[in-house]
Amino acid sequence: MEEKAELVCSYFKNNKSFLIGRNGSTELEVLSYYIKNGPNTQFPQFLMNRLETYSGIFPATQESVQRWVLRYVDSLKECDAIAEGWYEPLKMEEKALLDSVIPKRDSLFLRNLEPYYFDESIRWSKYLDKKNVGIINSFANTCEEQTYLAKAIWGDKSESLLPSTTHWIPIKTYFPPKISMGSKETSWPSPINSWEQTIDYVLKSFYEDPFEVAIIGCGALGMIIGAELKKLNVQVILMGGATQILFGVKGKRWETHNIISTFFNDAWVYPMNKPVNAKLIENACYW
């Protein structure tokens, strides 16, 4: 585990762009179904609904999901390293997919994406020092605000987790219609009505206020956004749902976690702007 943490650090020490990724469980379910049933497969509606609800891909139609699969697999090719094998039910299917798409990759453990699990000397986050860093997440604004409380959140670990010289650039992402139910604070801005347009929205934000490093946690959009940013010379790491933890933003999912729950103190906050149907996402696990 520590050796792989050093490997992640080595990517950040180098000035080259890279993509360090991870596959979410819902993404793996859809990809496995596609591989098993062939390119002309019709996805079951329940699976397409899951991809929208849990991972933000909309609309939940055959055409939309087919396009997402092709773009996602294409984006995987940009991965230099990936946290894999953590989702036990589809571990073998994931390995077969990655072996065919990116045979030459650095394989990581899921925890290698989360620097607070490691000693200061092997935390990749310390290399964010003096960099412009984009936070691409639904709670990006809260995350950025929390950086001003870094010392209160992380104590003497703060400089190696949220360096005080980092310039943070929040790019707020939103929720699919099934979750946001038209709420202005949590819906993608009009006229966005498909997952492809959400990618364009995020990239437009990057062009307006560029950064050198991106920390991403935005469901099944993340790998595609990450691949596009890597092509634009950005160093990218997909932390997934754990993104908020780095910034002292807690959620139900971690309240009983044997390690992460011990980090919580009065400086930690819950996310603002809960979408109408947040409970559909694992009983509002991020709030």
Model-derived regions, located:
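Electropositive, gly/pro-rich neighborhoods at or near active sites that engage anionic ligands
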Residues: 1-167
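Short, well-structured alpha-helical segments in soluble
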Residues: 66-74, 198-210
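Short glycine-rich phosphate-binding loop at a beta-alpha junction
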Residues: 82-83, 213-216
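Glycine-rich phosphate-binding "P-loop"
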Residues: 103-109, 166-201
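Cofactor-binding loop segments of dinucleotide-utilizing enzymes, especially the Rossmann-like FAD-
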Residues: 138, 173, 241
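Domain-scale recognition of functional cores that engage charged ligands
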Residues: 216-224
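C-terminal functional extensions of proteins
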Residues: 225-287
